[in-house]
A protein has these predicted regions:
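Alpha-helical bundle segments that constitute or directly flank the non-heme di-iron/ferroxidase center
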Residues: 4-20, 29-67, 84-89, 140-142
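Short, well-ordered alpha-helical segments
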Residues: 70-76
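Flexible, glycine- and charge-enriched loops at secondary-structure boundaries
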Residues: 5, 71, 95
Length: 145
């Protein structure tokens, strides 16, 4: 692994441990609890990818004709993260994005994806993010059972 990445991992280890001991994990006691958690957390997974693609668009070159933009180290870091997020591998060796893999796992455990499905449909149909959230009736904290 890249020495800088190893250094960053070491630097954030304390914060990572705080996140890993977050009380939300104690609330997930069974499959039903995991389903409920995933119905909301999937939006964070989607949002992370959207943020990452925004960073890629801003900090690297994604337009044509291609020209090098910004710091090569920054481009490398962003594109390495994009590669990992867009090219995950499932248990059968099939490539898919981390988001698609998460959605597949949700469906396998019987989690309700209707809020996400409505939201994505609204976004695809050109609604703003805020209108898409409103029209999908996304209710944080009240996931569907």
């Amino acid at each position: 692994m890249n020495p800088r990445v190893l250094q960053l991992k070491k630097e954030i280890e304390g914060q990572r441990n705080i996140l890993l001991s977050h009380p939300v994990y104690a609330q997930i006691k069974d499959l039903a609890g995991l389903r409920l958690f995933s119905q909301i957390h999937v939006f964070a997974v989607w949002d992370f990818m959207s943020l990452l693609k925004s960073l890629q668009s801003t900090l690297t070159s994604v337009s044509l004709p291609w020209m090098p933009v910004g710091s090569a180290e920054t481009r490398y870091l962003i594109n390495e993260i994009v590669l990992g997020e867009e090219c995950d591998v499932d248990e059968n060796g099939l490539r898919m994005s981390h988001f698609e893999l998460y959605l597949k796992a949700m469906k396998q455990m019987g989690a309700d994806t209707s809020m996400l499905d409505k939201f994505l449909k609204n976004v695809i149909n050109g609604e703003s993010l805020f209108q898409s959230i409103k029209n999908a009736d996304i209710q944080i904290g009240r996931a569907h059972v």
